[in-house]
Amino acid sequence: MIWPWSSQACAISDTELCNGHRARISPLALLSILLALLLFSPLLFSPASASHINSGQDIQAAIDSAQAGDIISVGAGSYSSIIIDRPLSLIGEGRPVLNAALQKPAVTVKSNGVTLEGFEIRGVEKDTASKFEYYMKNREAARGQRLDVPNAAVLVEGSDFLLLNSSIYRAQAGVYALGAEGITIKDSILNGCDTGLFLHGGRGLNVSGCSIINCRKFGLDIEWSGDTAVKNCSIINNSNVGILFREGEGADVDDNLISGCTFGLSLWNASHNQVRRNRVDHNYYGILVTNWSCYNNITDNLLIDNSRGEITAGFGIGLSLQENSSHNLVVGNVARGNYNGLEISKGCQYNAAYANNASGNKHGIRMNENRNNLIFGNSFLNNNINAYENLSRNVWNTTIGNCYSDYQGEDENGDGIGEQPYSIPGPQSKSADHMPLLRPFGKDEERMGAAGLQELVRGYATLPDEEEAEPAARLEKGIMVISSPRPRLSPRWGDFEPLDVSRSPFQEENYF
């Protein structure tokens, strides 16, 4: 039998003539050919063979000669800065060290789809004088460049970058990225940097299983970015903020340890985020939600021993909502051993605090200068002051109220609800819990979901506005104003605002 594909013209099944004969391929033969193509196609279309770099060899030369998709193995040793300008994977064997220099990141990523795994990366700390001197001596290096970019260990200018099982030490910025999407940092250490990671204008950041420790400013500084996930990380001893989300939305912050910071986690004008099951301890502010941060769910976090003495003896707040942050759900959190366990302050409205346990704090919950927040189903036990309201008017019950360990009323009909209201203490307080619980709201009760809570807020938080007292005197555009009606809404951004001496400590900027 003559093989029918003896020429290109005859490589057609069933109907073509080959040497004057009609050829036919049986279905079984055709199936065998297709299976063979499937089995051997990886060999026919395999990527370029991986380059292997041993200690002392030139990584940059290997990168420059590699093809897209190559895997470059880097042996143990110490190497200078590299630039990756094509989609490659660099795999460290024996923990090779990449060293940054002044204004020269250890790694500059200029391509999408780069993976860096198994490296120790040593950065350069902030040194303004040396940076100025560098650019004065290297004028061409400064041409067309932003001179305010920090000394970064890893500079990311592409998307879909993966940093795996690596360590970054003592950089002004451990990882620095502008407008990058799809960055993943996993099972890595960012230690002793000014800022562990800075991301501006990005999307899809995923940080998991990492230790971000001993940073002098921020552990993670994420601004104007969305769809971020920070999970199963240790954020410890970062001097200013452990995690800052500013002007962004869509973040999931789950199952982290956040400890030893001034602000553990801060949401600053950041909305539609989920903060769940984190342990937050030994900070000044455990979780701070401020500056118009709205529609966030703060759920099932452990807020303990946020009470320190370096600035103000014993001060510390487990969870604080401030500065017009509204429509947030604070649910199922445990606050213990703080100065204020829970706090809602300054212009916040339509928040729900539900099914929380605040015990053994100076104040269980403190409400300051706000109204129309719904507080119910919580347990305020053995605090110096269980609940406190200052210049506020809030709603403290639905069909159930809260449990207070100092409640003295009676339950005459045995329904678990006290017959006498619990008056909320505080200057000029008019609020009361009309359905105080005789036992803590516990795990036996089925917890209400987010949609149900939002519906209750709309139904119960309907107290009318009241004219609030104006401070006796204030400085306004250089003129001392003795008295005038107070505007109902503060301006969001003010260029010439008087100093607000009543604001909470440690807030760097005052916009109101």
Regions flagged by a language model, labelled:
Residues D70-S73, F315, Q349-A355, E369-F512:
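Acidic, glycine- and Ser/Thr-rich low-complexity intrinsically disordered tracts
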Residues Q60, D64, A68, S78-I91, ...:
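Extracellular beta-strand-rich solenoid/capping regions of secreted or surface-exposed proteins
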Residues L43-S65, A76, D406:
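Right-handed parallel beta-helix/beta-solenoid
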Residues Q67, D85-R86, E93, L102, ...:
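Parallel beta-helix/beta-solenoid
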Residues M1-W5, C10-S51, L163, V275, ...:
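Secretory targeting signatures
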Residues A100-T108, A129-L155, R170-A177, N191-H200, ...:
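Extracellular beta-strand/beta-solenoid scaffold signature
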Residues Q57, S78, L88, G94-P96, ...:
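Residues at the loop-to-beta-strand transition
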